[in-house]
Amino acid sequence: MGNKYEIPMDPVFQSTVMNIYWAVRELIANARDAQRRGEGEMVVKYLPRWQTLRIATLGIQLPMSTLVLGTSGAREREDNIGQFGEGLIMSLKTLALLVLMGHIEGVKVFNNREHWTPTIEYSPKWGQEILVVTTRKARKPSGEFSI
């Protein structure tokens, strides 16, 4: 197994604030911003065989610390399409994950050398259900961050 990271985010919050269209838009905008900054190549592709929408930034791997809400290294950039910098957007990626999980079964994240599996689990520490991301090493690097 891998490491488990608890993200104290109430699953009910996402259904009252965000929707699936917002989540997909934010993930695409974030990938586009990374590409415009020369940090990777954006890929948005529908795979009909698997009924899967792939949103990826090729050539990057994000550290787990980017899941911390409110962090950003690019917050002041005016050339971003997304509303926030990459680090803060990762927080929004976390929120987008939660939103997607509320609408789609089997959301997966590939982060170059790791696979991240998001789940909703009860946390005795927080006394409620929260988002939990479990990581495990990939058999071979994917060379990308994709959801």
Protein language model annotation of sequence segments:
Residues 52-118:
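Flexible ATP-lid and adjacent glycine-rich G1/G2 motifs of the Bergerat
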Residues 2-28, 73-80:
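Conserved short strand/loop->alpha-helix "switch" segment adjacent to the catalytic nucleotide/phosphoryl-transfer site
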Residues 7-9, 43-50:
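Non-catalytic, low-structured ubiquitin/UBL-interacting segments
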Residues 15-44, 87-98:
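Conserved ATP-binding N-box helix of the HATPase_c
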Residues 1, 94-112, 116-147:
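Flexible, glycine-/charge-rich segments associated with ATP-binding catalytic modules
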